[in-house]
Swiss-Prot record:
Belongs to the major facilitator superfamily. EntS (TC 2.A.1.38) family. GO terms for molecular function: enterobactin transmembrane transporter activity. The gene is entS. The chain crosses the membrane at residues 22-42, 56-76, 84-104, 110-130, 157-177, 179-199, 219-239, 257-277, 288-307, 314-336, 357-377, 379-399. This is Enterobactin exporter EntS. The keyword rRNA-binding does not apply. GO terms for cellular component: plasma membrane. It comes from Escherichia coli O81 (strain ED1a). The lineage of its organism: Bacteria, Pseudomonadati, Pseudomonadota, Gammaproteobacteria, Enterobacterales.
């Protein structure tokens, strides 16, 4: 038997052409969305000089994404998934063209930016849900951990590159260039996605979309295993909202403007290391227990983060959180895909992704409230240790998740 390496195995990109096409499309899409993410707030700030108006655009887009995830989950379980993915990407690109044309006007319309933000948020999340539901069919359920780790690396790398490119474009050509290249990138992603095989949903009875969505909710609530995974995911996302305290904590540590960047880079760096060293995760006999313990460790890291006497120690705590949260997230993703019936994959993936979106918003709001009553140090520690207490309770309550065992996949020569 070959020894499995700790390092991430990228062979899936070579052996599975369909996954390679998705990998390429996702990377281009992340870079394109990053260009958009830089341009929209800058344009609104330049037009209105109001941070409230910038925040409103983020809130509207987030709301549209939530609705898109719900609708996308139902569509992915009822219609051919490749068509849903292509339709969502193409429609999203049309919205980017609208933003580009609006930016070229002598007096761009603020209302148009808001409406197109709703449009793009809805259709972007629609395609995400269908793609998640299709992944097991593209790579095989035995390769989901590897696929999830490669995807996580793609997201992290794209998230680092795209803001830098977006900033350079803003400095040289203005927001219209950002929107135009985002539209071009989105339409380019259609080329590799066209090579995907047909991805029909499993046969199931026709029912009203709301009834179908409620069936997904009922399954989530009735399954201690899948429901517990989703709950842990939401709490983990809440913990990541600690970034709203970075500016205040930077003042407390007397950090320079250049040093503050280390705080923002620490969690993505830790997550990237977690993905790169995930080679043995798929071979864990008790993934549920490992998920619970890594989640508890990540909460502890956030609790200790604000208490550190030096900023460099705080950065180490954040990197540790990034690593542990990556381990937990990869286990969540894999177990969710393998333990959810094929007929429910679209809806459950939509609900899981939606609770991640809302968890981040709730966490930011709670930390903002704590910040009004406590010092930044106390707020960060209270959030981390509070989540740690909840996590310990869940460790005791989620018996089925804690005791879950799986037969590790066989290691073949190509995997080593």
């Amino acid at each position: 038997m070959n020894k499995q390496s700790w390092l991430l195995n990228l062979s899936l990109l070579k052996t599975h052409p369909a996954f390679r096409a998705v990998f390429l499309a996702r990377f281009i899409s992340i870079v394109s969305l990053g260009l958009l993410g830089v341009a929209v707030p800058v344009q609104i700030q330049m037009m209105t000089h109001s941070t409230w108006q910038v925040g409103l655009s983020v809130t509207l887009t987030g709301g549209a994404m939530f609705v898109g995830l719900m609708v996308g989950g139902v569509l992915a379980d009822r219609y051919e998934r490749k068509k849903v993915i292509l339709l969502a990407r193409g429609t999203c690109g049309i919205g980017f063209i609208g933003l580009c044309l609006n930016a070229l006007l002598p007096e761009p319309s603020l209302l148009a930016i808001y409406l197109l933000g709703l449009w793009d948020g809805f259709f972007a999340s629609l395609g995400v849900t269908a793609l998640l539901a299709a992944t097991p069919a593209l790579v095989g359920r035995e390769n989901l951990m590897q696929a999830g780790a490669i995807t996580m690396l793609t997201v992290r790398l794209g998230s680092v590159i795209s803001p830098m490119i977006g900033g350079l474009l803003l400095a040289t050509g203005g927001v219209a260039w950002n929107y135009g290249l985002a539209a071009a990138g989105t339409f380019i992603t259609l080329l590799p996605l066209l090579s995907l095989p047909a991805l029909p949903p499993p046969p199931q009875p026709r029912e009203h979309p709301l009834k179908s969505l409620l069936a997904g909710f009922r399954f989530l609530l009735a399954s201690p295993l899948v429901g517990g995974i989703a709950l842990l995911g939401g709490l983990l996302t809440m913990a990541s909202a600690v970034r709203v305290l970075y500016p205040a904590l930077a003042d407390n540590w007397q950090m320079s403007a250049a040093q503050i960047g280390f705080l923002y880079a620490a969690i993505p760096l830790g997550a990237a290391i977690g993905a790169l060293t995930s080679g043995k995760l798929a071979h864990s006999a008790r993934p549920g227990l490992l998920m619970l313990l890594s989640t508890l460790g990540s909460f502890l890291a956030i609790g200790l983060f604000g208490l550190m006497p030096m900023w460099i120690l705080g950065v180490i705590c954040l990197a540790l959180f990034g690593w542990l949260s990556a381990v937990s997230s990869l286990l969540q993703y894999t177990m969710l895909q393998t333990q959810t019936p094929e007929a429910m994959l679209g809806r459950i993936n939509g609900l899981w992704t939606a609770q991640n979106v809302t968890g981040d918003a709730i966490g930011a709001a709670l930390l903002g409230g704590l910040g009004a009553m406590m010092t930044p140090v106390a707020s960060a520690s209270a959030s981390g240790f509070g989540l740690l207490i909840i996590g310990v309770l869940l460790l005791l309550v989620l018996v089925e998740l804690r005791r879950f065992r799986q037969t590790p996949p066989q290691v073949t020569a190509s995997d080593s």
